[in-house]
């Protein structure tokens, strides 16, 4: 099955890390049937703490979803890669702001990341019946 590439028109406004924008090595998202797979994202302002980085990343994910005709309530799976378990509570608090009810299935992994000073990387899968 081939998919449709979703190219975010406003990546720079979405708080995405500049290296992600410049690389062009991957698509911000790929739609395959009713599913939308949003690539892992890293905050643009890495001087912020976990709360700030998480807010940037969820804002980015929300924008990519909207550009593809989806919304946060369509997210069925979320993966988070966190560099330090001590930051999990801060990440979780932000996550609850974006998914206050019926949160998606989720996985959190403690892991190193490719971008120095990044505390978090998230990716999501969304599903929509009418796609």
Language-model features and meaning:
Residues 1-76, 82-131:
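N-terminal presequence-like segments and the immediate start of the first folded domain
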